[in-house]
Design a protein with these regions (language model features):
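Structural signal for interior beta-strand "rungs" in well-ordered beta-sheet cores
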Residues: 3-142
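Long, leucine- and charge-enriched amphipathic alpha-helices
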Residues: 145-158
Length: 158
């Protein structure tokens, strides 16, 4: 009820489900659906996959900017807002009041608690169990410099 879906968005498409078999891939039938709550706005060019087994869930009050991908079996909590060009991989469970800056991503099968803000261009690689602000921007540089920086940062964090 009271939802807005902008042009060229695809709702309920099959998730990316394939099983390797004899040096090729066999499509895994997607049996779930997609449920969208009230007062949701979905920007232009978004794709939201239906669930593989259970439903993909977009709860009340969610606001999605343009060109966002939400994969199969994701649960996106109420009153969440996601900026353009973000992706959330399959089977991720996200609490309410989630905010995600542009060009960010969340890996699959993670859980993110309520009241989490993700800064722009951040990749979430593990579950988040404490509310707060998270960011992980690292500007582009040649591979050798990046490798040295990554080792330095890891050592400093211990």
């Amino acid at each position: 009820q009271d939802c807005i879906v902008h042009p060229n968005s695809v709702l309920g498409s099959d998730g990316f489900g394939f099983a390797p078999e004899n040096e090729s891939y066999q499509k895994i039938e997607q049996l779930g659906g997609l449920e969208i709550g009230d007062n949701v706005e979905i920007g232009a060019g978004c794709t939201i996959d239906r669930g593989a087994i259970s439903n993909t869930m977009i709860f009340d009050g969610v606001k999605l900017d343009n060109q966002i991908h939400i994969a199969h079996n994701v649960s996106l909590g109420s009153n969440s807002a996601i900026a353009a060009n973000c992706a959330i991989a399959g089977s991720t469970k996200i609490g309410k009041n989630f905010k995600m800056g542009g060009l960010s991503g969340v890996l699959g099968h993670l859980e993110i608690c309520d009241d989490v803000t993700i800064g722009a261009h951040t990749l979430i690689t593990k579950s988040i169990k404490s509310s707060g602000n998270y960011i992980g921007i690292m500007p582009a540089q040649n591979h050798m410099n990046w490798s040295k920086s990554a080792v330095f940062i890891k050592k400093r964090g211990k």
